[in-house]
Swiss-Prot record:
Keywords: ANK repeat, Cell projection, Glycoprotein, Methylation, Phosphoprotein, Repeat, Synapse, TPR repeat
Biased composition (Polar residues): 418-431, 1473-1502, 1557-1576
One GO term describing the cellular component: dendritic spine
Job description of the protein: Scaffolding protein in the dendritic spines which acts as immobile postsynaptic posts able to recruit KIF1A-driven dense core vesicles to dendritic spines.
SUPFAM superfamilies the record matches: Ankyrin repeat, P-loop containing nucleoside triphosphate hydrolases, TPR-like
Bias kind Low complexity: ranges: 1787-1802
BP terms from Gene Ontology: dense core granule cytoskeletal transport; in utero embryonic development; regulation of dendritic spine development; regulation of dendritic spine morphogenesis
Organism: Mus musculus (Mouse)
Region spans: Disordered: 1-85, 417-442, 1372-1405, 1438-1590, 1787-1807, 1826-1847, 1972-1994
Record's subunit section: Interacts with KIF1A; the interaction decreases in presence of calcium.
Sections of the chain in a coiled coil: none
Protein name: Protein TANC2
Length: 1994
């Protein structure tokens, strides 16, 4: 069949030829490929019978690859020989292909190259290329695949029918090919294992004959083929599992090739071939690109044995990813485990001296020059053995040739790694000279060895070691394994792109770039950064001459590569290289010092070393001594004579001496005569003697000669199996049996050393050379025939079952060419030998095109092999995998390989074929500047005007890269034909584009040339137009040059007349082009040529704006110096500063501000630079702007503030910065923070910090407000990854709230919060501790004890817990005793207890500190100054109000309103707080808490919010309309939705909910006891206010215990009320809203009767609260409460001193207007924001009202005093208060009284003041401090302390106040209401009438209306502004005015409201009068109330 098909082919018949669908450069689909391969296998495997189609010539592509064709065979080849003759010839020559024996072999038994490959690749099979591993886990081809270079897995006969493994994943990167290459390295242990059983199997097969043995043997041979692993013990790793680790870059298939100097570059093919590399290419094929898919991939199916092995590999233990670079495995047979190293210390000493010299011309390295066998390799190996890589010597040193491989102990330490000793393989011999000298020389050697970081051996018979890519890869792999360079290794692991850069694939494509960027530059940078030791490092390279044997046609050898790269080496990286004397010229370009080892006569040290070696050998062997002694004795004379004789013969060759002594030692030489005639005279004679002894007859040598021929011809070491198969490949009849083969190989074992990877290597390069080449006059006996070896190897490749991989195809071509078996046949047959060779290779493999386009053959092409592949049918237009799948011609044109280009063009390659980017070969050549290739292509009519996909022609590419000669040539080319065809693109267009291209790149010569072209009319060539823009980029020459900063070109163009103002196609003039890029020198040039520095572009932007936008500081400064206007705006109203802020360029911002740029400029959208900076997100710019006066609360036209923008853009650093600078958290802020957990954490943490700050200062109520508000704002869902953070934060907030509640005597809530914290964090000892303290405070000692025991379990070493545990145990005992002695203690006891508690572990701050661990650390760290989010710290440091403001701006306006109004706005808030907090510590609690509940609201946080806090504001804090308050009211219509602000809260938890919560709190024995038993209540812990008051007044403890009780009860009731808010009366009674107010008053009175002032304060606070209901919580009628309230108010008033008021500038409250407001507040507080009173009286009133900052101080202080009491009360008033307070905002922060609602809470008369965080820091502090009984003025106003307590708050005596209050109880309440306009408005709620206190925004419509008018003005926008601005609206001028107007107007609305609510009005009026009187009295009193509303109300 084959003969027939051959005939068909020769006659031109296409006998069913299978084209491999190669036309398009794509291989046939896998299925077709499969069939063709299968058919091939069947052809050779099944009896050798194959169909014609199988054997038909299969060109890779449809294009006939050979001249042979059907019609014109004769014409091209001349008269052909007869078909039979030609066929016979081919059959004879190729008969081996069809050997009959083959027919007997079952297909499964056939040896296939693929199987071999499998074996080769098995080790690598499971490995991935370094790069591919990084990107995907592509496995390299299965070991059985010819594509893989892994050693084949041993298989039995049945295993042969293997199919290829599945194709790797398509995701593999280009690097995937490397896996093959690198994979070729395998593990020693694996190979050992494999070869063991492979060998056994092969023996069995051997007896069977046929080819079976090949398979098994081959497999083991292959396994040895590429065998190298630094990890000897490691077995193969699964490629899939451990991709990177396994790629051993060891050159798997060592190429054994013939030395160059013996033949003219016989192994040139090696340059392009390296199995690994091919694998590399093969891996590329795996990339599933149709054109690149490997044809063999899908084929062989795995056989059993193979599968087992795979499994074994797959389950290898996992190892973490490692560097993907794997060093080559070097093994040097001449360095054995028995080698001896003697002397030569002088060499190391000289090397050391030279490398350390200061002479830069020689200190970069040393060249060691010597003849073959003179010890160069031993010197290098000695240094390696002593270096950090010494453990690798076990790989380098071979086992002794005489040791049986069976006995090799892979784990044995090689002597090379140890210090020289008698037993060491390389021992240092005695060296002449003094011991000191030897010591120094020894030190030099060890110093050098310690500096060695990498090494490389070049071995001619292992081609891979001679190739530059492998060299680079190996050196990098060893460098990263050097202990001195761990930083380099870490960098490679850290930067995978560096590993990719060093992958074998990258090294093949551009070894110089890989070495420079992957090795030298990283090392240099690490050295500069001092990350690697500051010392010299050495790279060793042995045998540079050997690498020359494999010099590629194109590309570098290792020595030429080093010559080019040495200039880039850092001074501390040295080289030590060796070279043979005969080839030392190749190193002449290396600037190294040279040391010669063969100048024996010149160097006495050499003689001494030889002498020492001879002495060592004689003394170490008795056999030698016996054989050289004449009479059995060795005397000095004999020794001297012998030594001299041997030294003379050796001429310095240690190899000669070693081999000679070996012969003597074994008895082959006996020197009994003194003539020594038997001693061989040269190394050649030594080898001859050895062979004569080994092969005494010619026939015995002939038996092994084929083995030697194959070994000599191979490019890399082969395994026994491979050699066996190659030998049998040449036999047509009767194959060699395995046993016979093994016997022959055993005879060669001393010459072919088995390496650790089971491959065979010649014992020494010199022996290999001796076998193939002899000098003249030498005997030619034992000469081998390399051609025969090439022939056998070619036959062997041809007999592979499947398709060869790329590398194997290249190798096959190499061997075919070297074999040249058709030599002389062409004349006989009439067919040229080259065509026959082409036929041969085409029959033998399918992947010719892929081999031609393989990576190595592209970058280091082998011209001859490439020609052979093309003759065989390779597709010359095949698309490669590089340069965008460019055809081969494109790649060769790009690389400048003229010969390859000519070859491709010769065979008709498409001259205009383009890559995927549209670039043709002409474009690539022009871009690279290869004029010769451009000329070649143009001669072939390449299209000059072809445009790539970027629209660029070849001329433009040449101009872009500055190739003037190419530009000139292309312009002179004929463009007419192309132009006519395309029509559109003309030569003039190309020239214009070339001008712009050259100008942009700064090529002045090309620009000048193009501008000087003759005019069009003069010649055909058209000159470029200097002011025109091109059709490609749309640039003019000047805009292009200016934009790229090409100053010289700009000068040239301007000199040539370019127009300065000529715009490009987009309308940009040169000035803008250059400013945008920051080239100020060109700006200067253009300005000097008349450009306008302030010209504007289409958008109105000036050059200064452009430069600022781009961040070019130098250009900005230059433009400013040139007079650029800093104030100009573009069409959007943006200035240069705006642009700089928008882009975040701090340096430019600083420069512009320093030059006077306005930081407050607003653009057309109202955005200031701060807004834009917050949008961009640069915290430093934001900080700078704020520090330089930018308005932090500025609102743009869309209602956004900088903080809101930062939150919206998720710029966390800016958010933190703005919060630190005092930005307020408004509703918009919360809204924008939705779904942004990171921002929410920041905002909540900010609230928590504020709370912590207040807590530290003792302002418990304010702190609780913050915490409560934060809890209210907690996101309900979507925590995601931040769940843990949020949980911790919530736990912290709950615990802090618990502490605050406890300090406020709200023990039930305290306990509840602690319980909730425990639910969230069951193992929290802090939560147990907090709950225990709460329980202890409520006298639940047993329960407290249980919690403490749990806490101590969780934290046994906490002293606080231990201390409290002891106390509680003691208390339990006392209680038991008391119970035994007497009935339960009267209610008073609790108070006693309370004081105790307070005094005990709980000093005011103690709580925080006791459990401070977490909370303080996490939240207290921030500066206290930052506490107030809303207010500027400086304005009211002490006030929580500012903070409150931000809280009020909680996402929901209502919420904010709620917060501000009820919690902050009114005492209710505080009461509510206690209630709500009590009610539900959780959300419910908070929600229900609504304002009151959340301590945050109650706290100054909310006070600060007052501006926005005011009910309206809060309700609609951002809505700007009071109605929101109403809206909130809507939600809880019953009472003026006191929850008003809390509307949302209430929604979340309906009032009922809150009620229940409060109830539960009330339920707590304390609270409810309070309600039930007033008398007890006093004793019980009081509300925070009362508690605080208690502390100061405990001693005095007024008889008013009842009021205190009331207070306490009120908290409980208040809470209840809260929930019940609808019925204000109930609230009053429960909470004692009025009671609260009154209650507070009472409790305060009771507590502080001694110091009435304080009591007054508390009372006044109570009054606010109390106003809610007619009946006070304690049960007193509202009148009573009022009385107490008024008394409180009076007290407060009185408490205020002029000094106090002044202390707080009115501006603190946003202006004096606030004070003026105050007076009005009396009547219409609720309705409007009142500016500060203008008149003194007003001021006083204000102060009494607490409206003024001073008042706020007072308020604050009272707050701190009464917070506990207030807490209880607020809950009650809360309902009304909410609604009412919504109406008014009195918080100091708020400018208007409308803040009253806030104020209410903030301002409770004095109590409210205490509760409210009014900026009065001093007052506040005092109040805190003065809590102690010592200061009578605990009332809360700074001056109060000085005043005697007898003076009531407003200067009215307590009694008077009470009296007035009682009569006006309702009025007073109302007055409270009046104070807060809301109160009046609240009338809608039942308790509102009496509840003036409830400042809830106008509950009544009238209130609302009024509120809308006044408050809206203020609350609406003003409120918002207030909310935003720390000083409040009043602070802002216009806003202040508005507030003033509002406040003034408010009186009328108040009246209106009063009318609406006559009763309320009456009360209000009365109250107002009283207040007026009080205020007058207050004025009389030392304190002049500056506070507007609170105190007046009181």
């Amino acid at each position: 069949m084959f003969r027939n098909s051959l005939k068909m082919l020769l006659t031109g018949g296409k006998s069913s030829r299978k084209n491999r669908s190669s036309d398009g450069g794509s291989e046939e689909p896998p299925d077709r490929r499969q069939s063709s391969v299968d058919s091939r296998q069947s052809r050779s495997g099944q009896g050798g019978i194959s169909t014609e189609s199988d054997c038909a010539f299969e060109p890779d592509y449809a294009v006939p690859p050979l001249p042979v064709s059907e019609g014109d065979v004769e014409q091209e080849l001349g008269p052909p020989p007869s078909v039979d003759e030609a066929a016979n010839t081919l059959m004879t020559r190729l008969g081996f292909l069809l050997g009959e024996k083959v027919t007997e072999v079952q297909p499964s038994d056939q040896y296939s190259m693929e199987v071999q490959d499998e074996n080769q690749t098995s080790a690598i099979t499971q490995r991935i290329s370094p790069c591919s591993t990084l990107t995907s886990s592509t496995a390299s081809p299965p070991a059985s695949s010819p594509c893989s270079t892994l050693p084949p897995v041993s298989t039995n006969a049945a295993a042969k029918d293997c199919s290829y493994g599945a194709v790797t994943s398509p995701t593999s990167t280009l690097e995937s090919r490397d896996s093959g290459i690198i994979a070729t390295l395998t593990n020693y242990s694996e190979n050992m294992e494999r070869t063991k059983y492979v060998g056994e199997g092969s023996k069995e097969l051997g007896s069977g004959g046929n080819l079976k043995p090949w398979q098994s043997q081959k497999s083991s041979m292959d396994s040895c083929l590429y065998r190298v692993d630094e990890n000897m013990a490691a077995s193969t790793y699964s490629l899939n599992k451990i991709p990177e680790r396994n790629l051993e870059t060891v050159l798997s298939q060592s190429v054994q090739s013939i030395p160059l100097y013996l033949m003219p570059r016989p192994n040139s093919v090696a340059a392009t071939s390296s199995a690994h590399l091919e694998d590399l290419a093969y891996l590329d094929e795996q990339r599933h690109t149709p054109l690149r898919t490997s044809l063999r991939m899908p084929r062989q199916s795995l056989s059993g044995a193979r599968t087992q092995q795979d499994l074994r590999v797959r389950f290898a233990p996992y190892r973490p990813p490692d560097i993907s670079l794997k060093p080559l495995l070097f093994e040097v047979p001449s360095i054995t485990t028995e080698s001896v190293f003697v002397g030569r210390d002088w060499v190391f000493h000289e090397i050391d001296a030279q490398l350390q010299s200061s002479n830069a011309s020689v200190n970069q390295g040393v060249v060691i020059v010597g003849n073959i066998g003179f010890g160069k390799t031993a010197i290098i190996s000695r240094l390696v053995a002593l270096s950090c890589h010494g453990t690798r010597m076990r790989q380098i040193a071979s086992d002794s040739p005489h040791a049986s491989p069976k006995h090799v102990d892979a784990n044995r330490e090689l002597p090379l790694t140890q210090a020289p000793s008698a037993h060491s393989s390389i021992t240092s011999g005695s060296c002449p000279g003094t011991p000191e000298m030897r010591r120094r020389q020894e030190e030099a050697m060890r110093r050098l060895a310690s500096q060695v970081v990498a090494y490389h051996y070049c071995q001619a018979d292992n081609a891979y070691t001679c190739l530059v890519p492998e060299f680079v890869h190996n050196v990098a792999a060893l460098l990263c394994r050097s202990p001195q360079l761990t930083a380099y290794r870490e960098q490679l692991l850290r930067e995978p792109h560096l590993q990719s850069m060093l992958s074998l694939r990258s090294c093949v494509q551009d070894p110089m770039a890989s070495f420079r960027r992957g090795v030298l530059e990283p090392l240099e940078n690490l050295h500069k950064e001092r990350k690697i030791p500051d010392e010299d490092f050495i790279i060793l390279i042995d045998g540079l001459n050997e690498a020359e044997f494999h010099k590629p046609d194109y590309g570098d050898t290792i020595v030429s590569f080093l010559s080019k790269m040495i200039g880039n080496f850092p001074s501390w990286l040295k080289l030590i290289v060796t070279v043979r004397t005969s080839l030392q010229e190749i190193t002449k370009l290396l600037p190294f010092h040279r040391i010669f080892l063969d100048r024996l006569e010149e160097n006495e040290a050499i003689d001494q070393d030889l002498q020492a070696y001879i002495l060592h050998r004689i003394h170490s062997s008795s056999e030698i001594q016996n054989n050289i002694s004449l009479n059995g004795k060795m005397d000095n004379t004999t020794f001297g004579k012998l030594s001299s004789h041997l030294k003379t013969l050796s001429q310095g060759s240690y190899l000669y001496l070693k081999l000679t002594f070996d012969l003597i030692e074994k008895g082959y030489l006996v020197l009994k005569s003194s003539s020594y005639k038997v001693v061989p005279v040269s190394l050649s004679e030594v080898y001859l003697l050895q062979c004569n002894m080994k092969f005494p007859t010619q026939s015995s040598f002939d038996r092994v000669m084929p083995l030697l021929n194959v070994a000599v011809a191979s490019l890399h070491p082969l395994t026994d199996e491979h050699i066996f198969q190659a030998i049998n490949a040449g036999s047509i009849e009767g194959t060699l049996e395995w046993e016979d083969f093994q016997q022959r190989m055993e005879n060669l074992s001393m010459f072919l050393i088995k390496r650790r990877d089971m491959t065979r290597m010649f014992v020494h390069p010199s022996f290999r050379e001796w076998l193939i080449w002899r000098e003249e006059g030498e005997k030619t006996k034992f000469l081998c025939d390399p051609r025969s070896g090439h022939t056998l190897l070619a036959f062997w490749f041809s007999r592979q079952e499947g398709k060869l991989n790329r590398q194997q195809t290249i190798e096959l071509g190499h061997h075919i060419l070297k074999a040249h078996i058709f030599k002389g046949l062409s004349k006989k047959v009439g067919v040229s030998s080259s065509i026959l060779q082409g036929l041969w290779i085409s029959y033998s493999t399918e992947g010719l095109s892929m081999a031609l386009a393989s990576l190595r053959n592209l970058y280091t092409p082998n011209i001859k092999v490439s020609r052979l592949l093309i003759l065989g049918g390779a597709n010359i237009n095949y698309r490669t995998e590089v340069l965008n799948n460019a055809p081969i011609l494109c790649v060769q044109s790009h690389l400048g390989y003229t010969e390859m280009v000519a070859l491709l063009l010769e065979f008709g390659a498409n001259v205009d074929a383009s890559s995927e980017s549209g670039l043709t070969p002409l474009g690539y050549a022009a871009a690279a500047g290869f004029l010769s290739i451009v000329v070649l292509l143009c001669k072939k009519r390449a299209k000059v005007d072809h445009l790539d996909k970027n629209g660029q022609c070849a001329l433009v590419h040449a101009a872009l890269r500055g190739h003037l000669e190419v530009v000139k040539f292309l312009i002179q080319c004929d463009w007419t034909m192309a132009g006519q065809q395309q029509g559109v693109f003309k030569k003039s267009h190309a020239i214009q584009q070339a001008l712009i291209a050259a100008a942009s790149m700064g090529y002045t010569e090309i620009v000048s040339y193009l501008l000087d072209l003759p005019e069009k009319d003069e010649e055909e060539v058209e000159r470029a137009q200097i002011n025109s823009f091109d059709s490609l980029w749309g640039e003019t020459a000047l805009t292009a040059a200016a934009g790229r900063g090409k100053l010289d070109v700009c000068r040239l163009l301007l000199e040539q007349g370019a127009a300065v103002a000529q715009p490009n196609r987009r309308g940009a003039v040169p000035l803008f082009s250059t400013v945008r890029q920051g080239h100020w020198q060109i700006v200067d040039l253009l300005l000097t040529h008349g450009a306008d520095v302030n010209m504007a572009d289409k958008q109105g932007r000036t050059p200064l704006m452009m430069a600022a936008s781009e961040g070019h500081l130098g250009t900005v400064d230059f433009l400013l110096a040139q007079g650029a206007s800093i104030a100009l705006m573009d069409k959007e109203g943006l200035t240069a500063l705006s642009w700089a802020c928008l882009k975040g360029h701090l340096s430019v911002v600083r420069s512009l501000v320093d030059n006077g740029a306005a930081t407050d400029h607003a653009d057309k959208n109202g955005r200031t630079p701060l807004d834009l900076a917050a949008f961009y997100g640069d915290a430093e710019v934001v900080q700078f702007l704020v520090d330089h006066g930018a308005m932090i609360e500025h609102v743009d036209y869309s209602g956004m503030r900088p903080l809101d923008r930062a939150v919206g853009c998720r710029n966390t650093s800016v958010v933190v910065t703005l919060l630190k600078k005092g930005a307020k958290i408004g509703p918009a802020t919360w809204a924008m923070a939705t779904s942004k957990p990171d921002i929410m954490i920041i905002l909540l943490s900010k609230l928590m910090e504020e709370g912590d700050m207040f807590y530290k200062k003792g302002k418990v109520k304010e702190a609780a407000q913050r915490y409560q508000y934060a809890l209210k704002k907690f996101p309900r869902e979507g925590f995601g990854e931040d769940l843990k953070t949020f949980r911790e934060l919530k736990v912290s907030l709950l615990l802090n709230l618990s502490r605050c509640r406890r300090k406020m005597n709200d023990f039930g809530m305290a306990e509840e919060f602690a319980t909730k914290a425990l639910e969230l964090k069951p193992k929290s000892y802090e939560a147990y501790y907090a709950r225990a303290r709460a329980k202890r405070s409520s006298r639940q000692f047993a329960a407290a004890l249980e919690d403490l025991k749990e806490a101590i379990k969780l934290c046994p070493n906490n002293r606080e817990i231990q201390r409290l545990l002891m106390r509680v145990e003691e208390e339990c005992r006392q209680m038991q005793q008391q119970q035994q002695q007497q009935p339960p203690p009267p209610p008073q006891q609790p108070p006693q207890e309370l004081p105790e508690e307070e005094t005990e572990p709980e000093p005011q701050h103690e709580d925080i500190y006791s459990v401070q661990d977490i909370f303080e650390e996490e939240y207290l760290e921030q500066d206290v100054e930052n506490v107030s989010i809303g207010l500027q710290t400086e304005a009211r440091p002490s006030q929580g109000l500012p903070v409150i403001q931000s809280p009020p701006s909680s996402p929901a306006h209502r919420d904010s309103a709620y917060i501000s109004s009820s919690p902050l706005g009114s005492h209710q808030v505080f009461d509510f707080r206690s209630n709500s907090s009590v009610g539900s510590p959780t959300r419910q609690g908070y929600q229900s808490t609504s304002p009151a509940l959340s301590p945050t609201h109650q706290n100054s946080h909310y006070r600060p919010s007052p501006p926005h806090t005011s009910p309206a504001h809060q309700g609609a804090s951002y809505r700007f309309s009071p109605p929101p308050v109403g809206g909130q009211s809507k939600e809880y219509p019953s009472p003026p939705p006191s929850p008003l602000r809390r509307g949302p809260q209430y929604r979340a938890s309906p009032p009922a909910e809150s009620m229940s919560v409060y109830r539960s709190q009330s339920g707590s024995p304390v609270r409810y006891q309070q309600e039930t038993n007033v008398s007890q209540l006093p004793g019980r812990p009081k509300s925070p206010l009362s508690k605080m008051a208690q502390r100061p007044y405990q001693m005095p403890q007024l008889p008013v215990a009842v009021p205190q009780q009331g207070l306490r009860l009120q908290p409980a009731k208040a809470q209840i009320v809260r929930s019940n808010q609808p019925s204000s009366a109930v609230h009053s009674s429960t909470v004692i809203p009025t009671g609260a107010y009154g209650q507070v008053a009472h409790s305060m009175a009771s507590k502080y009767q001694s110091s009435q002032g304080d009591m007054g304060v508390s009372q006044s606070r109570l009054v606010y609260q109390g106003s809610i209901g007619g009946i006070v919580g304690d049960g007193r009628p509202v009148q009573h409460v009022q009385a107490s309230l008024s008394a409180g108010a009076i007290c407060q008033h009185g408490g205020l001193t002029k000094e106090d008021l002044p202390q707080r500038p009115s501006s603190a409250y946003r202006g004096g207007m606030r004070y003026s407001q105050t007076p009005q507040i009396g009547r219409s507080q609720s309705a409007s924001y009142y500016p500060v009173c203008h008149s003194k009286l007003d001021l006083e009133r204000s102060s009494s009202q607490l409206g003024s900052p001073d008042v706020s101080h007072l308020i604050r202080r009272p707050i701190s005093v009464n917070p506990n009491e207030i807490k209880p009360h607020p809950p009650t008033p809360r309902p009304l208060l909410h609604s009412q307070s919504v109406g008014l905002r009195f918080s100091p922060s708020s400018n208007s009284i409308s803040s009253t609602s806030n104020l209410t809470p903030t301002f409770r008369p004095s109590s409210s003041i205490q509760q409210m965080e009014i900026p009065l820091k001093p007052a506040y502090d005092r109040s805190c401090d003065e809590l102690s009984p010592v200061s009578p003025t605990q009332g809360g106003y700074p001056s109060e302390p000085t005043r005697s307590r007898t003076t009531p708050f407003m200067g009215i005596i307590d009694k008077t106040a009470r009296t007035q209050q009682y009569p006006h109880l309702h009025q007073q309440n109302r007055t409270w209401a009046v104070s807060s306009v809301d109160t009046v408005l609240s009338p809608t709620s039942p308790g509102n009438l009496p509840q003036p206190e409830s400042f809830s925004p106008p509950s009544s419509i009238s209130n609302i209306a009024f509120y809308n008018k006044t408050n809206n003005a203020q609350n609406g926008h003003l409120l918002e502004d207030d909310y935003y601005s720390p000083h409040g609206m009043l602070a802002n001028g216009s806003r202040g005015d508005l507030l003033e107007r509002v406040s003034q107007a408010s009186s009328y609305p108040d009246v209106k409201v009063a009318r609406t609510l006559p009763v309320a009005q009456a009360y209000q009026d009365n109250l107002y009068r009283q207040l007026s009187r009080d205020s007058r009295q207050g004025q009389t009193s030392p304190i002049k109330p500056k506070r507007p509303f609170v105190e007046s109300n009181v």
